[in-house]
A protein has these predicted regions:
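A glycine-rich, often tryptophan-bearing local segment used as a flexible ligand/cofactor-contacting loop or short
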Residues: 28, 86-163
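Helical hinge/lid and interdomain linker segments adjacent to catalytic or ligand-binding clefts
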Residues: 24-28, 33-118
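Positively charged n-region of N-terminal signal peptides that target proteins for export
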Residues: 1-4
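Charged, low-complexity interaction regions
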Residues: 301-309
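Extracellular ligand-binding/catalytic regions of CAZymes and related secreted enzymes
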Residues: 21-23, 29, 47, 54, ...
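Bacterial N-terminal signal peptides
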Residues: 7-17
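Catalytic beta-strand/loop cores that center a nucleophilic Ser/Cys/Thr
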Residues: 133, 141-208
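Short, solvent-exposed loop/turn elements at domain surfaces
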Residues: 33-38, 89, 195-198, 222-225
């Protein structure tokens, strides 16, 4: 006689439990395959997972390559690919059917930097349909890339991914001449080689599910920029159908968060490290003293109101003619300047963490 009431109660409890369930995000990275502090897939994924948890009840997992555990994809709301040629990873023959089933289920899909690419002809079309756009890395493909300082600009201020950030300077390895589906919507633009290109996009798949692609994140240190990381985390939130806060995602971090694990840190060029010379070596002392003076010069400019892009441009111009500096080695990252001495010692001048731009 009371069975309908009991049944209704069980249904309501199940509904409430479903509402309270954490949002599951699987981030797929891989071991290092590039030079020092670039393509730092796994450390980047760990940081993104950390920032997601600052924005609600998220359950995250970072996988080293395509997961083989039977329940790895169970209940996953979104998959983030930050690896070598994400399309080839996602639609690899060994699990292409599994990947397509995830897409058909309507999961969110996010690809970052090289993860946006595909080189295998068999994966290219399925990847394009899944992501809405991709870096065509096939032999003879038309997509290009260039390392260049640019400004990341809002393409659609009304889109949720655009919340909480404004145009910001960034040096990255930009992919351009990408292939897009007509329904893909640019959310971020950058000028590469003097021409505007979409570098971030959102795509609502006709069969259900959201996809977000962003070609930046070649350099690990770019994550020191708050608007840069907010753009990325906004995109992941949107892909999971989580409401993006009006002020954008929370993306708090500390300087130590940019430290790399040993697997990636060991890529530091040991042969060109001052540590290979005896302690107290007069040359090392002089070069380190010079580096400290250059850092002080950069700090002084910022303390006196010089904007970050101008301060970086000024210190870069100064280093190009500084004694003992290899001018071909001087590079800005948007959050600092790398340079090497004529002996091959590498140094980095960094924008103080508390002076990096915030986009509220």
């Amino acid at each position: 006689m009371n069975r309908p009431v009991i049944s209704l109660g069980i249904t309501l409890l199940a509904f409430v439990h479903a509402l309270a369930a954490p949002v599951k995000v699987l981030l797929i990275g891989q071991p290092p395959d590039h030079g020092y502090r670039s393509h730092t897939y796994l450390p980047d994924c760990e940081l993104i997972a950390k920032w997601l948890k600052q924005n609600g009840d998220f359950e995250t997992a970072v996988a080293r390559g395509w997961p083989t555990e039977p329940h790895a994809f169970e209940g996953v709301a979104a998959v983030v690919l930050h690896d070598k040629l994400g399309g080839d990873v996602f639609f690899a023959p060994a699990h292409a059917a599994q990947a397509q089933a995830l897409i058909d289920r309507g999961i969110g899909l996010v690809a970052l930097h090289w993860g946006t690419g595909s080189a295998e002809p068999a994966a290219g079309e399925p990847w394009l349909r899944a992501l809405g756009g991709h870096f065509n890395a096939q032999k003879g493909g038309f997509s290009r890339y260039k390392v260049e300082a640019s400004t990341v600009r809002l393409a659609d201020p009304s889109h949720p991914i655009s919340r909480g950030w404004q145009d910001f300077p960034m040096r990255d390895e930009w992919y351009y001449d990408l292939r897009f589906l007509p329904a893909a919507k640019p959310v971020a633009l950058a000028k590469v080689g003097g021409k505007d290109y979409p570098v971030g996009w959102a795509y609502e798949r006709p069969s259900g599910g959201r996809s977000f692609g962003f070609v930046g994140l070649h350099f690990h240190d770019n994550l020191a920029s708050e608007p840069f990381r907010r753009l990325i985390v906004n995109g992941v939130l949107w892909a999971t159908r989580t409401e993006v806060p009006a002020a954008g995602a929370t993306v708090k971090m500390e300087p130590k968060d940019l430290d790399l694990p040993e697997e990636f840190e060991k890529l530091r060029p040991a042969a060109k490290s001052p540590a290979n010379r005896p302690a107290g070596d007069p040359l090392i002392v002089r070069r380190m003293t010079e580096c400290a003076a250059y850092q002080e010069r950069l700090d002084h400019a910022l303390e006196h109101g010089t904007a970050i892009p101008q301060a970086l441009a000024e210190i870069q111009a100064f280093l190009l003619t500084a004694p003992g500096v290899d001018p071909k080695s001087v590079e800005t990252t948007g959050v600092g300047v790398h340079y090497k001495t004529t002996e091959g010692f590498g140094y980095y001048l960094r924008i103080p963490f508390d002076r990096l731009p915030e986009s509220k």
